[in-house]
Each structure stands twice: as C-alpha cells, then as structure tokens.
UniProtKB/Swiss-Prot annotation:
Keywords annotated in UniProt: DNA replication
Entry protein name: DnaA initiator-associating protein DiaA
One function term, GO molecular function aspect: carbohydrate derivative binding
Physiological role: Required for the timely initiation of chromosomal replication via direct interactions with the DnaA initiator protein.
Protein's UniProt keywords contain Nucleotide-binding: no
One Pfam assignment: SIS_2
InterPro entries, per the entry: DiaA, GmhA/DiaA, SIS_dom, SIS_dom_sf, SIS_GmhA/DiaA_subfam
Amino acid sequence: MLDRIKVCFTESIQTQIAAAEALPDAISRAAMTLVHSLLNGNKILCCGNGTSAANAQHFAASMINRFETERPSLPAIALNTDNVVLTAIANDRLHDEIYAKQVRALGHAGDVLLAISTRGNSRDIVKAVEAAVTRDMTIVALTGYDGGELAGLLGPQDVEIRIPSHHSARIQEMHMLTVNCLCDLIDNTLFPHQDD
C-alpha cells in the first residue's frame, strides 16, 4: 500500500512538471481572455460534471467571493449548481441540454464559457460549447487525453488548456491547479496592488 501511495504522488508530480513545461502560454491566454471579458462588463459561465463540476463551482465561488485577497466581486456563474433547473431539463429527457439551455438563456456576446471536461467528450459539455458559439461567446476549455470532441469545436479566439496526461485523476488534479492559477492571474491583473 505504501508503494501505491508513492506512485500516486510521483505520477502527480510528473504530470505537474509536464504541465509546467507545456501549459503556461495557454493558461496566460486563457487568463487574459477572462480578464478582457470582465473588463468589458461581461461574465463567465462555468460548467463540468463530477469533479469537473466541483472545479467549475470553485472557480465561480473564487470570482464572486474572493480567491486569496479581498477585492470586489466578479461575475461568474457555475451552471451546475441549480438542482431545480438541472433536474427540470433532465426530466424532460434532455440531459445533454442541461448546460446548453442555460448558456442560451444567460450567455451573451463577449461572455466566456469555462468548460471543464477530463476527456472532452461529455455530451452536455459539448452541447454547451455549441450553444456558446451561437451566442458569440469565447470558450476556455480545460481538457485532458486528446481533447476529445470539445477540442474540435474551438475556434481561433478560444483557448484549450489540455493537461498532458491520460490518467483522469491526474487531469482532475491539474484542472484544480489550473483553476487556481487562473484565479491568481485574474486577481493580480485586475487588482495588482491589493494586500494579502
């Protein structure tokens, strides 16, 4: 059992090192995309399933409340938090539409959709991205593996942050770290002189 624990930590560290080499440009572009949207009075819609939903919710909470420093609230909505809306849509046998319907209702040109999917193939996330495209929104996608179907939907203005791994647990860990990096970059760009 102790060896297995060491393997988990070693895999995580190796994934972090690979990501630190491969992802800074994409993370920087994503942060600037989010900052630009916020500075123009727009909002960020976030979605994911399972652990990815938790990461989406963490991002939205960090925008609305704060990340590490006190600052004004920033507009972000985690689309996976309203159980009444989610179950109403799913109850009508439209599970694939649970996020897309919300994007069509709440999203506007200039808003950003933060779509988080470990493999990039979750139908409800893919449909949300398709809906965001019809609303002239920009997409920031956190993926892994080969980026899946989601990667193929992105345009030149969109940003994919693809974790260099084929292990779901490592991808999810890196998604959380990436979300924290994005929050840190947003705070330090918009509020550079805030005290800790």
